[in-house]
């Protein structure tokens, strides 16, 4: 690193070069976050339920978190989404259309004790899942 009176050009050039060794900068500058994001930068996405799955909670908790495997309509990618609420999984059937959004973990990752699940189900067949769980609305018959 230049230390002298006229070292500004070298300092500037070095800082521009060395910031590529910072993983956060490299991911942002390379647009890698958007490339790897199944929702492609969108806040929500729609998909078709492929199957219901039970995900075991991480230690020290002991539970089976009810999740669904969803294939996104926009790009065909498959993701896991958590069904929030007591008995919420009973309102979701295979081949239903669901709307998912990020679960809100740090850096866009999974949250709490549910490993590998980054998304949460908000709507089932265009009806809010929370409304179905508390009994305020009924799931439409097809």
From Swiss-Prot:
InterPro entries reported in the protein's UniProt record: NA-bd_OB-fold, Ribosomal_uS12, Ribosomal_uS12_arc, Ribosomal_uS12_euk/arc
Classification via NCBIfam families: PRK04211.1, uS12_E_A
Name this protein carries in UniProt: Small ribosomal subunit protein uS12
Domain of life from the UniProt record: Archaea
Organism listed in the record: Methanospirillum hungatei JF-1 (strain ATCC 27890 / DSM 864 / NBRC 100397 / JF-1)
Functional summary from the UniProt entry: With S4 and S5 plays an important role in translational accuracy. Located at the interface of the 30S and 50S subunits.
Alphabetic keyword roster: Ribonucleoprotein, Ribosomal protein, RNA-binding, rRNA-binding
One Gene Ontology cellular component annotation held by this UniProt entry: small ribosomal subunit
HAMAP family: Ribosomal_uS12_A
Family membership noted in the UniProt record: Belongs to the universal ribosomal protein uS12 family.
GO biological process, one term: translation
Assembly behavior: Part of the 30S ribosomal subunit.
Cited SUPFAM superfamilies: Nucleic acid-binding proteins
């Amino acid at each position: 690193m230049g230390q002298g009176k006229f070292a500004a050009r070298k300092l500037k050039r070095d800082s521009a070069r060395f910031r590529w060794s910072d993983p956060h900068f490299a991911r942002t500058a390379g647009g890698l976050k958007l490339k790897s994001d199944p929702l492609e930068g969108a806040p929500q996405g729609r998909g078709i339920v492929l199957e219901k799955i039970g995900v075991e909670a991480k230690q020290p908790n002991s539970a089976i978190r009810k999740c669904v495997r969803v294939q996104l309509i926009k790009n065909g990618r498959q993701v896991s989404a958590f069904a929030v609420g007591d008995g919420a999984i009973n309102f979701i059937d295979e081949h239903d259309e669901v709307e998912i959004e990020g679960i809100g973990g740090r850096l866009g990752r999974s949250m709490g004790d549910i490993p590998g699940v980054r998304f949460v189900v908000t709507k089932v067949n265009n009806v809010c899942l929370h409304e179905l769980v508390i009994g305020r609305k009924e799931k439409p018959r097809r």
